[in-house]
Swiss-Prot record:
Gene Ontology molecular functions: calcium ion binding; calcium-dependent protein binding; copper ion binding; fibroblast growth factor binding; lipid binding; protein homodimerization activity; RAGE receptor binding; zinc ion binding
Residues holding Ca(2+) 1: S32, E37
Modified residues (Phosphoserine): S32
Cystine pairings recorded for this chain: none
Tissue specificity field: Expressed in heart and skeletal muscle.
Subunit structure: Homodimer. Part of a copper-dependent multiprotein complex containing S100A13, FGF1 and SYT1. Interacts with FGF1 and SYT1. Interacts with IL1A.
Subcellular location: Cytoplasm; Secreted
Protein name per UniProt: Protein S100-A13
Any GO BP: mast cell degranulation
Residue ranges occupied by any EF-hand domain in the UniProt entry: 18-53
Main location: cytoplasm
Role, per record: Plays a role in the export of proteins that lack a signal peptide and are secreted by an alternative pathway. Binds two calcium ions per subunit. Binds one copper ion. Binding of one copper ion does not interfere with calcium binding. Required for the copper-dependent stress-induced export of IL1A and FGF1. The calcium-free protein binds to lipid vesicles containing phosphatidylserine, but not to vesicles containing phosphatidylcholine.
Alphabetized SUPFAM superfamilies for the sequence: EF-hand
Length: 98
């Protein structure tokens, strides 16, 4: 019996998780993003959403709750949450203008 295909939302969540681990495995620890891995992920995968962030080093520091110079998945998830909130705000403004 074939598994049912994932919904669009399920695929999106899977992509968020897979992207983290794809970049986390490039150097050092395989379960966290180094500074270089974080910068590469942002540059390649989030160039439009984080184009106005200023310093990526400062952004990483703000996400790195335990200040170990690595982003664990839960710290990376904070970034995803921040981006989702910004997208929601923009969509909300568009709706209000109509």
């Amino acid at each position: 019996m074939a598994a049912e295909p994932l919904t669009e939302l399920e695929e999106s969540i899977e992509t968020v998780v897979t992207t983290f681990f794809t970049f986390a495995r490039q150097e050092g620890r395989k379960d966290s993003l180094s500074v270089n891995e974080f910068k590469e992920l942002v540059t390649q995968q989030l160039p439009h959403l984080l184009k106005d962030v200023g310093s990526l080093d400062e952004k990483m520091k703000s996400l790195d709750v335990n200040q170990d110079s690595e982003l664990k998945f839960n710290e990376y998830w904070r970034l995803i949450g921040e981006l989702a909130k910004e997208i929601r705000k923009k969509k909300d403004l568009k709706i209000r203008k109509k």
